[in-house]
Swiss-Prot record:
Protein name: Pyridoxal 5'-phosphate synthase subunit PdxS
Pfam families: SOR_SNZ
Matches recorded under HAMAP family: PdxS
Binding sites annotated in the UniProt record for D-glyceraldehyde 3-phosphate: 166
GO MF annotation terms: pyridoxal 5'-phosphate synthase (glutamine hydrolysing) activity
Keyword terms of this UniProt record: Lyase, Pyridoxal phosphate, Schiff base
């Protein structure tokens, strides 16, 4: 039974159910209820949103299990939680708690700088970040059921998420248009499993959903990522660090769903109050860029 529950087909199917939606970071039950009422398809339970993690510095770990439990009991939508890259026990604890997804996340301080989790060993589905197709396929090869761009979390600056999504999509088009005898060389170049390149060639797309994340702060940002081909969006600090979280949450959900209705997005963007304060990426030292974590 465990093997059936944890099969790739089941786990990827669960992720497909979130397609077209918004997943919001929350730090308590009240925020989780706001997210659910706004139309979020899932919430990510954590102790601090990425902008606060960035500001605090030091080591960022898995959220206190009491916070995760509080969020799980507050909402009926799926609940995700973050584990550190390579931290087997954090992931096993979250799996034992019954979370719906685990995010092996670069937002937290990596526990292992050499090895990511072997996600196929778990019954719970995983979401992982990527900056390019090589990273995406390595994570899928380890068992990830869902991808997201890394972007640059906690900045309110969407430029890195745009860069990562455009790069993945450009590399996908290249693979899809290759002849079969070129795929092995491309697999070597990407550092990715050959079998996954064959899947992409056959399917004409990634075998899992790919959401946008990292720096999304406004309804227009969310719509932009959908316009560029994202399957949905994660919003971290952008909602609950804004002036009016309830309005921002509802507006971002609507903009994600109706991303080509520009008149609607204009109306949604009126009277929202101030968005979260943004950071210029070029002003961040390389060691402060969360997207650099993992490989």
């Amino acid at each position: 039974m465990t093997k059936i529950l944890g099969s790739d087909l089941i786990k990827r199917g669960m992720a497909q159910m979130q397609k077209g939606g918004v997943i919001m970071d929350v730090v308590n039950a009240e925020q989780a209820r706001i997210a659910e009422a706004a139309g979020a398809v899932a919430v990510m339970a954590l102790e601090r949103v990425p902008s606060d993690i960035r500001a605090a510095g030091g080591v960022a770990r898995m959220a206190n299990t009491a916070i995760v439990r509080e969020v799980m009991e507050a909402v009926s939508i799926p609940v995700m939680a973050k584990a550190r890259i390579g931290h087997i026990v954090e992931a096993r604890v979250l799996e034992a708690m019954g979370v719906d997804y685990i995010d092996e996340s670069e937002v937290l301080t990596p526990a292992d700088e050499e090895f990511h989790l072997l996600k196929s060993d778990y019954t719970v589905p995983f979401v992982c970040g990527c900056r390019d197709l090589g990273e995406a396929l390595r994570r899928i090869g380890e068992g990830a059921s869902m991808l997201r761009t890394k972007g640059e979390p906690g900045t309110g600056n969407v430029v890195e998420a745009v860069r990562h999504l455009r790069k993945v999509n450009a590399q996908l088009r290249k693979v899809i248009n290759m002849s079969h005898d070129e795929l092995m060389t491309e697999a070597k170049h990407l550092g990715a499993p050959f079998e996954l390149l064959l899947q992409i060639k056959t399917l004409g797309k990634l075998p899992v959903v790919n959401f946008a994340a990292g720096g999304i702060a406004t309804p227009a940002d969310a719509a932009l990522m959908m316009e560029l081909g994202a399957d949905g969006v994660f919003v971290g600090s952008g909602i609950f660090k804004s002036e009016n979280p309830e309005k921002f949450a509802k507006a971002i959900v609507q903009a994600t769903t109706h991303y080509q209705d520009y008149d609607l997005i204009a109306r949604l963007s009126a009277d929202l109050g101030e968005p979260m304060r943004g950071l210029e990426i070029s002003e961040l030292a390389v060691q402060d860029r969360m997207q650099e974590r993992g490989w």
